[in-house]
Amino acid sequence: MNLAAMDPQTYDTQLEHKRIKLEQAFAQFETPSVEVFASEPANYRMRAEFRMWHDGDDLYYYMFDKVLNEKVRCDQYLPASVLINQMMSALIAELKPNPSLRHKLFQVDFLSTLSGEILVSLLYHRQLDDQWRADATALKAKLSSQFNVNIIGRARKQKIDLDKDFVVESLQVNDKTFLYKQIENSFTQPNAKVSVKMLEWAIDATQNSQGDLLELYCGNGNFSIALAQNFNRVLATELAKPSVDAAQYNIEVNGIENLQIIRMSAEDFSDAMAKKRSFRRLEGIDLDSYVCNTIFVDPPRAGIDPDTLALVQGYERILYISCNPETLKDNLQQLNETHKVTRFALFDQFPYTDHMETGVLLERR
């Protein structure tokens, strides 16, 4: 975190520097002009994590400033959603005078939504007992007069859900509303409004598509659910069980009937497609019946492994969302041999940082 860089008045300048840096870094691939999708300059993060500092009777949130090399008190936090900032104030007022709730509390995580739900996770360096549960239940009841809130307590090998451990986000994407179950302690897009722009860009990039779509690393179905409208069928893979469970919920609640989720890694799926190995999880699924002309990938920061990259290269069109320009550039060295970049986008998920989220559409040469 660099608090000094978080100045909304300099946001446009910082974003322009990112655009220039990105265009220069990828100039060798003769990309089209970068499509730039800006963030809100403040209150854009839907989740935030704070450490807790105990100072006598005082108790406050803090973060570590890497530039100043010191902890910084955070009574409010400019990047966090308005809902998180409101909850920060209300929550700390209740925690301070309560011995049970504050005892050995070392971290608080917030997960909020545009739909108005918020999840608060309290993390402790002690085991949670009946007194904690009673006080946390009373806390939830009091906060519920102002917020649509759920509370989770965590300690070593212990997790207490007072109600549920997820929120349901509602995103307006073009003329459609999509609902997404987001589970505590699982990956979700941090900047909801930029996430909407990413979905709309991906939908536009795949308009008038032929055949089916294959998606690797689908998470909770964020993209595959929105993109299903552009394809006959969608086949998606994800390894993390909580994400797969959330994806199945999201498929049902959004009424998507042409999307199949398989729980397996991209590497294993590559082996299955190459018929190197058979997998019980694929029983009843006829991979050969899918006519996938388009593949969508949103890999982790490490990028795409060599075997999967070879698989990806076999498709006419590749839609690649990247959270790491360095590994995207490395992957493009190979993909550029057979495909040409026809669209290139910068999504500013993380203002005031060096982080750049990018989107690339590649089409066979």
Curated annotation (Swiss-Prot):
One of its GO terms (biological process) is tRNA methylation. Its EC number is 2.1.1.-, 2.1.1.35. It comes from the Bacteria. InterPro entries: MeTrfase_TrmA_AS, MeTrfase_TrmA_CS, SAM-dependent_MTases_sf, TrmA_MeTrfase, U5_MeTrfase_fam. One of its GO terms (cellular component) is cytosol. S-adenosyl-L-methionine binds at residues 189, 217, 222, 238, 298. Keywords: Methyltransferase, S-adenosyl-L-methionine, Transferase, tRNA processing. PANTHER family: TRNA/TMRNA (URACIL-C(5))-METHYLTRANSFERASE, TRNA_TMRNA (URACIL-C(5))-METHYLTRANSFERASE. Belongs to the class I-like SAM-binding methyltransferase superfamily. RNA M5U methyltransferase family. TrmA subfamily. Dual-specificity methyltransferase that catalyzes the formation of 5-methyluridine at position 54 (m5U54) in all tRNAs, and that of position 341 (m5U341) in tmRNA (transfer-mRNA). This is tRNA/tmRNA (uracil-C(5))-methyltransferase. It comes from Shewanella baltica (strain OS155 / ATCC BAA-1091). The gene is trmA.
